[in-house]
C-alpha cells in the first residue's frame, strides 16, 4: 500500500533565545493510503502541532510534508489554501458550525467557498448528512442540535469535497461517553465505506483503540 502522506525530519520552533520552545524535534512519520492512526501523548507533547502541519494549517521551521510524494510546502500560500480545501478535511474539538445556517448549509460551505454552485453542492451535502445519521436534521440550525449531532454535521462538512485525508483534533473532547462512542463509530464507518485516511489526536483510549495504529509523541519526538 502506497503512502499518502510522509512527514520528514519535521521541526517546529516558536520564539527565539530565552523564549525559544522546540515543539517538534525531527519527527518522521509515514501514513499509508486508507490507514487510521491515533496520535497520543501528554499535553504539550506536540500532537496538535504535528496535526496542523500535516494539514498545512501552519508551516514548519524545517523538514517537509509530502502528500502523494509532493512537498506541499513548496506551494505558495494561495495554492496551499486551494490544495488544503480540496484534499484535506478537518474536525476539531469544537464544531465551529455557523449558527445562522442550517445543517445542510453548513455542510455545503466548503464546496461553495471552492466555487461550486449551490445546486451542485446540495445533493452531496444531504447524502453525507444521511450517511452520518442526520437525514432528519437537514434544515435544523446548530442551536437545535445536540452536541453529538453538531459534531456529526462537522464530520459531514469535512467530507463534502471528498478529501483523501481526514484530520481530527480531539473530536470527542467535549462529549460524554455515550455520545463519544457514537462519533467514534461514525468515524470508523466512514473509513470502512470510503477508504479514507484518518489521523486523530486524542486522549480517549477507546477512540485510540479503534484506530489501526497508535503513534505516541513524547517531548516533540515519536516514541519508538
UniProtKB/Swiss-Prot annotation:
Membrane topology: Peripheral membrane protein
SMART domains linked: AAA (SM00382)
EC assignment: 7.6.2.-
Cystine bridges: none
Domain ABC transporter, first and last residues per copy: 5-224
Record-listed ATP binding positions: 41-48
Pfam families: ABC_tran
Family matches, as PANTHER family: IMPORT ATP-BINDING PROTEIN, LIPOPROTEIN-RELEASING SYSTEM ATP-BINDING PROTEIN LOLD
Subunit structure: The complex is composed of two ATP-binding proteins (LolD) and two transmembrane proteins (LolC and LolE).
Protein name: Lipoprotein-releasing system ATP-binding protein LolD
Organism annotation: Geobacter sulfurreducens (strain ATCC 51573 / DSM 12127 / PCA)
Gene: lolD
Amino acid at each position: 500500500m502506497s503512502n499518502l502522506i510522509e512527514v520528514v525530519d519535521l521541526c517546529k520552533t516558536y520564539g527565539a533565545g530565552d523564549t525559544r520552545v522546540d515543539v517538534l524535534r525531527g519527527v518522521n512519520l509515514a501514513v499509508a493510503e486508507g490507514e487510521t492512526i491515533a496520535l497520543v501523548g501528554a499535553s504539550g507533547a506536540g500532537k496538535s502541532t504535528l496535526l496542523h502541519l500535516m494539514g498545512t494549517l501552519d508551516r514548519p521551521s524545517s523538514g517537509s510534508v509530502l502528500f502523494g510524494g509532493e512537498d506541499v510546502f513548496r506551494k505558495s500560500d494561495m495554492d496551499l489554501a486551494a490544495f488544503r480545501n480540496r484534499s484535506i478535511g478537518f474536525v476539531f474539538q469544537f464544531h465551529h458550525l455557523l449558527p445562522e445556517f442550517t445543517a445542510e448549509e453548513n455542510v455545503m460551505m466548503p464546496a461553495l467557498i471552492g466555487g461550486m454552485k449551490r445546486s451542485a453542492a446540495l445533493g452531496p451535502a444531504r447524502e453525507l448528512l444521511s450517511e452520518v445519521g442526520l437525514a432528519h436534521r437537514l434544515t435544523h440550525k446548530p442551536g437545535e442540535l445536540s452536541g453529538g449531532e453538531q459534531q456529526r454535521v462537522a464530520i459531514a462538512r469535512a467530507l463534502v469535497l471528498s478529501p483523501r485525508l481526514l484530520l481530527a483534533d480531539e473530536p470527542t473532547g467535549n462529549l460524554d461517553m455515550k455520545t463519544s462512542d457514537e462519533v467514534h463509530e461514525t468515524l470508523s464507518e466512514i473509513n470502512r465505506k470510503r477508504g479514507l485516511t484518518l489521523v486523530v489526536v486524542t486522549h480517549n483510549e477507546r477512540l485510540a483503540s479503534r484506530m489501526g495504529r497508535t503513534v505516541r509523541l513524547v517531548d516533540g519526538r515519536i516514541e519508538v
